[in-house]
Amino acid sequence: MESLAAALGHPVDAKLLILSADQLGSTHAATAGGFAALREGVATTGTVMMPGPWSRDAADRHDGADLGIHLTLNSHLDCYRWGPLTAAPSLLDGDGGFPRTVDDLWDHADLDEVRRECRAQIERARLWGFDLTHLATHLGTLQQRPEFFDVLVDVAYDAELPVRLESGRAEERAGFPFRRLAAEEGILMPDHFTLVRGGARAHLDATLAALQPGVTVVAFEPAIAAEEIRAIDPDAAQRMDDLDVLTDRAVRDRIDTAGAVLIGFREIRDLQRARR
């Protein structure tokens, strides 16, 4: 079977690297930080949270950037909440927003309402002018349970978009072969995925040192230094560190030294659509 790298026109042993700035639209700091990473740094793609209060600002500023949808069914912060775009009572918690935890959502979410909400987030993004390149799922909500994953596959297929899925032992933890199931529907996904959770510089260096052939996604959550993000997010310092790493001029040299080639999701999306 042809590798994704070869299908994209690269040597079969090429090390292709996608650096993602996640969660644009969630806060002003994350939106500004994401665009800084894309325009001034080495980020090659990003994701937008359409239920986020700053998603409209992200739409006004995107200027054709390689951006996907961070399909959002949770509102994980204690003092800063968002909820569904649709009328979806089963997707609300007692505070009137999305549930804070994945387990809470799984316990009472109606799958028809989940499907409508995911479609609405994609439709709003397109209405606002985003040229969507892929889908991701916030907190893995749509990945780790088969009935929810069915929704993700359905909306990805209809939208003709690749999906960012976890790799490694994630399928073992989930208990079902979600990567194979997506591939059977013609949905493309990168070969490897890692999410930075603190220590961004060391994490990226370790990833580059162990980089395998194929397409690898490293996801960051950059944010500018602002009182807003410090007040609402206990991980604010890590987000600011993510931005520092993504805009560090020396990082590009380290990427070159590792023999990696930077790409985005647009190439993968176009390949998937060409195969339909």
Residue ranges and their predicted role:
Residues R119-L188, T194-R201, A209:
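Catalytic domains of cell-wall/extracellular-matrix polysaccharide-remodeling enzymes
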Residues A5-H76:
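Active-site beta->alpha N-cap acidic-glycine motif
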Residues V163-R164, I232-R276:
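C-terminal domain-boundary segment and adjacent tail
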Residues D78-W106, P234-A237:
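Active-site gating loops and adjacent loop-to-helix segments of metal-dependent hydrolytic enzymes
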Residues L16-T27, D103-R115:
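Active-site mouth loops of central-metabolism enzymes
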Residues D22-L24, M49-P53, H70-N74, H138-G140, ...:
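Active-site beta-loop-alpha junctions enriched in small/polar residues
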Residues L16-I18, A43-T47, G64-H70, L132-A136, ...:
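Structural preference for beta-strand elements that scaffold enzyme active sites
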Residues G9, G34-E40, R56-G68, R81-D93, ...:
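Acidic (Asp/Glu)-rich catalytic clusters
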